[in-house]
Amino acid sequence: LKDAHPGSTVTILTMGPGRAADIIREGLFRGADNGYLLTDRAFAGADTLATSYALATAIRKIGDCDIIIGGRQAIDGDTAQVGPQVAEKLGLTQITYAEEILEVGKDKITVKRHIDGGVETVEGPLPIVITVNGSAAPCRPRNAKLVQKYKHAKTVTEKQQGNLDYTDLYDKRDYLNLVEWSVADVNGDLAQCGLSGSPTKVKAIQNIVFQ
């Protein structure tokens, strides 16, 4: 998309603990322009409702977006609810189970999506939320030049914990400073974040071992 639309910007947004900064670096290695890490103890224990609230709040802070792309579902809860809930909270159209973006026009997008028994081609207005199916083509590989450019990119927390001996590097090269946001930074409501904002409660966990 970025190559086909000169002047466009790709922004990475992820929510998680400090180590989730690795996801942002990986995106930068593959051609993204910038990234934001949504991290705060107050986000811990979030179900899909609280997760989608936090992400939608951060997206509003980032500003105008034409296309918001996310995975279909996480590998733990496996519910596929966060993407649609983000779309609902932002008041945007959504296309789920996307396999390929066929065309992006001035005010609409054409997408091929996976359905039971085949595929279908659909159109949607911009801005839009798209969740990508596992059958989509793999993302672009790492770019060696970008790996060299961003390999020292760090969040404030990482720099504080790392006892780095090249801190002046971050003053000279602002693109190496990864942004991390707390609940307060995105003007979030604590009552809607983490366990406080999660109506889903885990009653029990059982390990199942297949013989």
Q: Where are these predicted regions, by residue range?
A:
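N-terminal glycine-rich FAD/FM-binding segment characteristic of electron-transfer flavoproteins
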Residues: 1-211
